[in-house]
């Protein structure tokens, strides 16, 4: 079995995963660059009980520990859905102090922005999740007032990488690590508009992997495994 996105825990399975913990940590790192004085953050979580939600939340918590100038003022469940996120944020906003940033898990950004706008609250820096409506909103705000943020998420096309990993296993490769970490897809102020141009209305940014890219990903993870083994063996 080759799994992707979510995690299969059986040792015999292969797992193609994004470093979701780093993803959460990088959300706070980016906010720290733009908001050196810190402030209150609103966290929008994903589906409760999933490994992805736990990992991203853990990364966000680690980022806040490294940057104590920030504090999580409140946390709501957005379930990776714009409408759900908008309702959840709208419900909690009246009880919150000024929010300087919104950290989330992808797909919540546009809903959060709509909630702040409807409540006539000052727009915080909202981390986006690579969806077309989020990036389009970001583009509009950038043109209007120079709005700056960061966007990241797993690429739906990671399923193609899992396919090629399965093909390599069936082709007889015995050296493929059972845990394969691949980069998440991220955009910044300089390149998100180019990505937006290629995303259909209602869609999400993605990348389809080739066989060669899959082989490079496998080799990169093999090197990581070898380096960890070497480090462990070098310890007294």
Regions inferred by a protein language model and the residue ranges of each:
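Solvent-exposed loop/turn segments at secondary-structure junctions
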Residues: 1, 7-10, 47-51, 78-82, ...
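Structured segments of extracytoplasmic/periplasmic soluble domains
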Residues: 4-7, 30-38, 63-67, 88-95, ...
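Flexible loop/hinge segments that line or gate small-molecule binding clefts
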Residues: 1-22, 26, 33, 40, ...
């Amino acid at each position: 079995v080759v799994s992707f996105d979510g995690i299969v825990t059986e040792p015999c399975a292969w797992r193609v995963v994004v470093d979701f913990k780093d993803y959460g940590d990088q959300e706070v790192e980016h906010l720290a660059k733009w908001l050196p004085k810190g402030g209150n953050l609103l966290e929008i979580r994903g589906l409760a009980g999933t490994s992805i939600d736990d990992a991203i939340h853990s990364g966000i918590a680690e980022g806040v520990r490294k940057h104590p100038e920030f504090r999580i003022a409140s946390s709501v469940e957005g379930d990776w859905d714009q409408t759900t996120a908008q309702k959840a944020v709208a419900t909690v906003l009246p009880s919150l102090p000024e929010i300087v940033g919104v950290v989330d898990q992808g797909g919540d950004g546009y809903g959060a922005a709509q909630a702040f706008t409807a409540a006539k609250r000052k727009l915080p820096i909202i981390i986006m999740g690579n969806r077309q409506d989020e990036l389009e909103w970001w583009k509009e705000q950038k043109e209007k007032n120079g709005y700056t943020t960061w966007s990241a998420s797993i690429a739906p096309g990671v399923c193609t990488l899992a396919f090629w990993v399965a093909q390599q296993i069936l082709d007889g490769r015995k050296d493929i690590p059972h845990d394969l970490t691949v980069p998440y897809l991220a955009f910044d102020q300089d390149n998100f508009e180019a990505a937006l141009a290629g995303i259909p209305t209602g869609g999400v940014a993605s990348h389809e992997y080739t066989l060669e890219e899959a082989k490079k990903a496998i080799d990169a993870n093999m090197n990581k495994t070898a380096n960890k083994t070497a480090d462990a063996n070098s310890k007294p």
